């Protein structure tokens, strides 16, 4: 679907001793079934933009639409439910629960939505097997490699069949070959007609996206790849 996610005149400022405007009148439309890379130096607004799209934070000014429906940032509970069902989030530091196994980390994300433990366990096990972790189901995060941990994080992000996947430096701490595998797992999500947006400093992976978006001076400059 074209223009599934629409950002219009988005600005975001943070109040410090001096007001800092990170995003400046940013507008862009994203389509499903595509993967977009965000590039830019540290402080260019990549993570801030992902936080706005994920509804973790709100813009100072501007409008965000999903499927032509505007987000009301005063409806926190409704937005939390929308995010849990429709947006999968992956971080460089994968934020896995340290006292839970790989299987538990994934199935708990679905249990909060489905309220069906057996169904959640089955979905989680199937996803982990698909990403090559059938022999790591009962391993804790401390027992997993960086690449294995990110595979768990990706499985957790997609278990609720989200329409959008957001990834903030998902390959940043991985060696090149492992990072390639993780990128391919993300790229394959296009086949499920999902919208994938990932922030990266790595030009190689940025160029593999359908669209490369440079974050410059708080706005987006599209670059065709």
Where are these regions (language model features)?
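Conserved ABC transporter NBD signature motif
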Residues: 62-73
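A short, proline-enriched helix->beta-strand linker immediately N-terminal to the Walker B motif
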Residues: 159-163
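Helix-to-loop junction immediately C-terminal to a conserved catalytic motif
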Residues: 54
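The feature captures the beta-strand-to-loop junction immediately N-terminal to the Walker
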Residues: 39-41
């Amino acid at each position: 679907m074209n223009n599934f996610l629409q950002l219009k005149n988005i600005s975001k400022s943070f109040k410090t001793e001096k007001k800092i405007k990170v995003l400046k009148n940013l507008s862009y439309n994203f389509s499903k079934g595509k993967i977009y890379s965000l590039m830019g130096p540290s402080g260019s607004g990549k993570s801030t933009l992902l936080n706005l799209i994920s509804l973790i934070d709100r813009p100072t000014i501007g409008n965000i639409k999903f499927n032509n429906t505007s987000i009301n940032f005063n409806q926190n509970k409704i937005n939390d439910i929308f995010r849990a069902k429709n947006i999968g989030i992956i971080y460089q530091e994968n934020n896995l629960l340290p006292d839970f196994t790989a299987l538990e980390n994934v199935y708990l994300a679905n249990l909060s939505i489905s309220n069906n433990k057996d169904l959640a366990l089955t979905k989680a096990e199937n996803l982990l097997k698909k990403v090559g972790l059938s022999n790591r189901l009962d391993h804790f995060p401390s027992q997993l490699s960086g690449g294995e941990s990110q595979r768990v994080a990706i499985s957790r992000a997609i278990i609720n069949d989200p329409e959008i996947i957001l990834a903030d430096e998902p390959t940043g701490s991985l060696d090149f070959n492992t990072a390639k595998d993780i990128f391919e797992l993300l790229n394959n999500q296009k086949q499920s007609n999902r919208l994938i947006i990932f922030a990266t400093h790595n030009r190689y992976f940025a160029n593999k996206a359908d669209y490369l978006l440079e974050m410059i001076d708080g706005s987006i400059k599209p670059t065709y790849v």
